[in-house]
């Protein structure tokens, strides 16, 4: 079962060391763990409840609605992954995000805590309500555990100085 962490208040979003913008309403982080149920004869076999469960890792989905941003800066997120700035163009099929170094660091600088994900990529980057007075830019990131088998770090959370 997934769980969510809500960051209330202002959050500055930095991706690949570039400040993408500011979210006055905070961001949400959804942690999704992966499990494998282990069956055993003494607990009913395949039809019974698991005798144990094995943790297989976790990913985080981060959603930020930027209310203050430079459009040119956030549009560059698409070109980071070979999208280019041409609408409708997608990466080459078969592109491996981690193996081809397309994953970057994501940092959420909040009023109380700074959260860092070392391995993240953009899932969605869309401007909403363009052309009207109130508009925002929605960024959705997917974050994976660090590619260091000894550490298995998904994110670090430290008090904001």
Annotate each PLM feature:
Residues 65, 87, 91, 142-144:
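Residue-level recognition of well-ordered secondary-structure positions
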Residues 61-65, 105-107, 138-142:
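Beta-strand secondary-structure signal
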Residues 33, 110, 145-147:
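Residues on the solvent-exposed faces and adjacent turns
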Residues 117-161:
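Short, charged interaction patches at domain edges and termini
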Residues 88-129:
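Acidic-leaning, charged glycine-interspersed low-complexity segments
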Residues 18, 80, 109-111, 160:
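Low-complexity, intrinsically disordered/propeptide-like segments
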Residues 75-102, 152, 156-161:
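Charged, amphipathic alpha-helical segments and their flanking helix caps
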Residues 1-74, 114-136:
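Solvent-exposed edge beta-strands and adjacent loop segments
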């Amino acid at each position: 079962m997934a769980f969510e962490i809500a960051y209330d208040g202002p959050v500055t979003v930095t991706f690949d060391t570039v400040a993408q913008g500011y979210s006055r309403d905070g961001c949400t982080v959804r942690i999704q763990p992966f499990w494998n149920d282990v069956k055993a004869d003494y607990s009913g076999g395949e039809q019974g409840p698991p005798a144990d469960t094995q943790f297989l890792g976790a990913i985080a989905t981060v959603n930020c609605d930027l209310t203050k941003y430079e459009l040119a800066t956030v549009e560059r997120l698409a070109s980071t992954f070979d999208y280019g700035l041409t609408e409708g163009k997608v990466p080459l099929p078969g592109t491996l995000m981690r193996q081809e170094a397309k994953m970057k660091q994501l940092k959420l600088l909040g009023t109380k805590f700074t959260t860092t994900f070392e391995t993240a990529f953009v899932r969605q980057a869309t401007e909403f309500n363009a052309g009207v007075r109130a508009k925002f830019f929605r960024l959705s990131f997917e974050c994976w555990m660090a590619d260091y088998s000894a550490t298995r770090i998904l994110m670090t959370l430290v008090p904001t100085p």
